């Protein structure tokens, strides 16, 4: 029986999603010897330095952190990485592209956990695009990295169903759970040399382009089902929005009126009640349930019904 060996890992990531994987690795038998994270950001009126979730965790565990701001600056850190003597680099939600030079450093190569079932939704926003497209399933794919984006051979894949109420936030949570288990299992397989590579079928690949904030403005000419998908895709960022009476409103949650699926009255306020704000679309009625006025906390429409009845007057058109 082959015994699993402890691997020396350099972890590349920045976000809260990445943080969950780093924590799982720190709790495993493997050793995280270095971190690649995005540069610190300045935040708030005081322009204070804001550390990423991954950097905070790395500092707590006293792990060496490298923060290049480009592929070129990462290449310049080649000697620093060599000194770490890592067996493998694990990439989870990291924005800087690794060059051939960096990819060739670890003896076991570099692997990337991607939040889709590759080759579907290669690129920067796979969860958002899966929700917008009405996909019924998504998942995680772990690939052996090459010098192209998300095209490397597949090492591990796990499927996750998408519910009609899922948002990007809820799917990230689901994928984090299955992804952490997958990473640990795959590392065991790699450490004993028992793993398979499956090459991707490029002919069925789709691309998930980066989210632009302008996409979040609600287009009431779309069918209700598409607006609902967008609202869920853009939760928690950049958050769908619209304007009414000169006020900027964020839409966090909505549902489709299944009893009126053929009505076409884009942007028209049809009713305001404890169920929500009923708005006509290109096809069907969308019921806005959770909104956020500028400078206020988000709230259910039914919790602030008097306020919303003054703002959303039946018959008016939302911009």
Curated annotation (Swiss-Prot):
(6S)-5,6,7,8-tetrahydrofolate binds at residues 116-119. Gene3D superfamilies: Formyl transferase, C-terminal domain (3.10.25.10), Formyl transferase, N-terminal domain (3.40.50.170). InterPro entries: Fmt, Formyl_trans_C, Formyl_trans_C_sf, Formyl_transf_N, Formyl_transf_N_sf, Formyl_transferase-like_C_sf, GART_AS, Met-tRNA-FMT_C. Keywords: Protein biosynthesis, Transferase. One of its GO terms (molecular function) is methionyl-tRNA formyltransferase activity. Its EC number is 2.1.2.9. CDD domains: FMT_core_Met-tRNA-FMT_N, Met_tRNA_FMT_C. It comes from the Bacteria. The keyword Transferase applies. Attaches a formyl group to the free amino group of methionyl-tRNA(fMet). The formyl group appears to play a dual role in the initiator identity of N-formylmethionyl-tRNA by promoting its recognition by IF2 and preventing the misappropriation of this tRNA by the elongation apparatus. This is Methionyl-tRNA formyltransferase.
